[in-house]
Amino acid sequence: MLFVALLSTRPGNTFQEGVARRLQWDYPEGANVLAEYWLETEAPRVVAVVEAQSMEPFGQIRMDWGDMFEIEVFPVVTAEQGMEMARQAMTSGQG
């Protein structure tokens, strides 16, 4: 399954603190990171695109980073997958 994680900075934390911690941290087992973006905003500050079989790796991410970030995780599909699903829905609806 494909997920997007949005990490928004909690008040009182600095970018420098986050970078120092990130340099020492790796994603948990079961999380295949496809992309990680650092934004020039506080909310969200980080966007990660992750493949995982379940939500389990995100529990560990929340434990590791929950003090510094508000973390939201959403299941997603690619634009190509979404368009294919729309085509199939439109075709089946034409009966």
Regions found by a protein language model. Give the residues of each.
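Conserved, structured core segments of small domains
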Residues: M1-G95
